[in-house]
């Protein structure tokens, strides 16, 4: 179970302590548990949603979104912000884009992107609460973190060394594809036709974002992986709320 705890420690702000420094093979296997961590997030958010019944609508949605951000520690939002800055400031140049991603400072485009994504998530949550479609809280985190597994399965990692390289090099690929299949099945069981719609929408957006990354970078980084997760979560919430 160590790979699960590695995944939970990396993807969440929950107080998880590991017995020591994980081996590269254990890091690679931790990717197999990313969808499960997403489902755990979804269950926690679904329970919180039920507990907030009777709370004024806007406050209800704001508390859900706050809990969502706190659960991940803002990790993927940071990747989204860095990617937004780099894509605009990189002017189509690969090395300049990668260099900007490493800059810890956030420019105006990063701030605007974060505001827009959080605003879209908030308004989608308002609509979903009104429509009593709480199952979307299970789907979005599951699909978002499943997408990270899918990304490492089909996309080169372009930064040599570090955690991302260990994940990419030691991911068990056959098991990874099986876990992705089980994740899709879980979405269908949890959401029915809405689950199928969410998976199809996320798949189309995933491959478009991957194509954009391949054209600019020739692969992915940790920051662009975080951006993919955030954008897919947002798309799933909006898709279920609108259709």
From Swiss-Prot:
What would be one Gene Ontology cellular-component term for the protein?
A: plasma membrane
Q: What is its EC number?
A: 2.7.8.26
Keywords recorded for this protein, A-Z: Cell inner membrane, Cell membrane, Cobalamin biosynthesis, Magnesium, Membrane, Transferase, Transmembrane, Transmembrane helix
Q: Which residues cross the membrane?
A: 31-48, 61-81, 109-129, 134-154, 188-208
What GO molecular function terms would the record report?
Answer: adenosylcobinamide-GDP ribazoletransferase activity; cobalamin 5'-phosphate synthase activity
What GO terms describe the biological role, i.e. biological process, of this protein? Answer: cobalamin biosynthetic process
Give the pathway annotation.
Answer: Cofactor biosynthesis; adenosylcobalamin biosynthesis; adenosylcobalamin from cob(II)yrinate a,c-diamide: step 7/7
As cofactor, the record names: Mg(2+)
- Principal location listed in the UniProt entry: membrane
Q: Which compartments is it annotated to reside in?
A: Cell inner membrane
Could you tell me what this protein is called?
Answer: Adenosylcobinamide-GDP ribazoletransferase
């Amino acid at each position: 179970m160590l790979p699960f705890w590695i995944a939970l420690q990396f993807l969440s702000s929950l107080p998880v302590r590991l017995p020591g420094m994980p081996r590269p093979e254990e890091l690679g296997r931790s990717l197999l548990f990313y969808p499960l961590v997403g489902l755990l997030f979804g269950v926690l958010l679904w329970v919180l949603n039920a507990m907030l019944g009777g709370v004024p609508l806007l406050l209800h949605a704001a508390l859900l979104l706050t809990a969502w951000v706190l659960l991940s520690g803002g990790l993927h939002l940071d990747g989204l912000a860095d990617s937004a800055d780099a894509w605009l400031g990189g002017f189509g140049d690969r090395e300049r884009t990668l260099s900007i991603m490493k800059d810890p400072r956030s420019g105006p485009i990063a701030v605007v992107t974060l505001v827009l994504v959080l605003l879209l998530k908030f308004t989608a949550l308002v609509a979903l609460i009104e429509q009593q479609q709480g199952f979307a809280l299970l789907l979005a985190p599951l699909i978002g973190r499943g997408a990270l597994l899918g990304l490492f399965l089909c996309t080169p990692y372009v930064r040599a060394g570090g955690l991302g390289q260990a994940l990419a090099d030691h991911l068990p690929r056959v098991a990874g594809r099986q876990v992705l299949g089980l994740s899709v099945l879980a979405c269908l069981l949890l959401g029915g036709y809405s689950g199928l719609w969410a998976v199809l929408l996320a798949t189309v957006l995933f491959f478009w974002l991957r194509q954009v990354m391949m054209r600019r970078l020739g692969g992915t980084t940790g920051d662009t992986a975080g951006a993919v997760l955030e954008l897919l979560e947002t798309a799933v919430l909006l898709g279920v709320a609108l259709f």
